[in-house]
Amino acid sequence: MPKICQITKKKSMLGQNRSHAMNATKKKFSLNIQYHTFWLPEKKKKIRIRITKKGIRMINKFGISKIYKKYII
């Protein structure tokens, strides 16, 4: 399963490590993805989603009901 946030749709990025001599080696920047369970009061059930820390902050700000309707459905 790819590391993609279900709310923000962010993916991991590719970049380069640079040494002191400016030699470039490829690097993958991974996301802070976690599984999190939320309770939906309208549907009276729990949902489990893969979400980044920024997505959790969005849910705390706007509420799970609004985010669920806008991004997940």
UniProtKB/Swiss-Prot annotation:
InterPro entries: Ribosomal_bL28, Ribosomal_bL28/bL31-like_sf, Ribosomal_bL28_bact-type, Ribosomal_bL28_sf. Keywords: Ribonucleoprotein, Ribosomal protein. The keyword Flavoprotein does not apply. One of its GO terms (cellular component) is ribosome. Pfam families: Ribosomal_L28. The keyword Ribonucleoprotein applies. GO terms for biological process: translation. One of its GO terms (molecular function) is structural constituent of ribosome. Belongs to the bacterial ribosomal protein bL28 family. NCBIfam families: L28. This is Large ribosomal subunit protein bL28. The gene is rpmB.
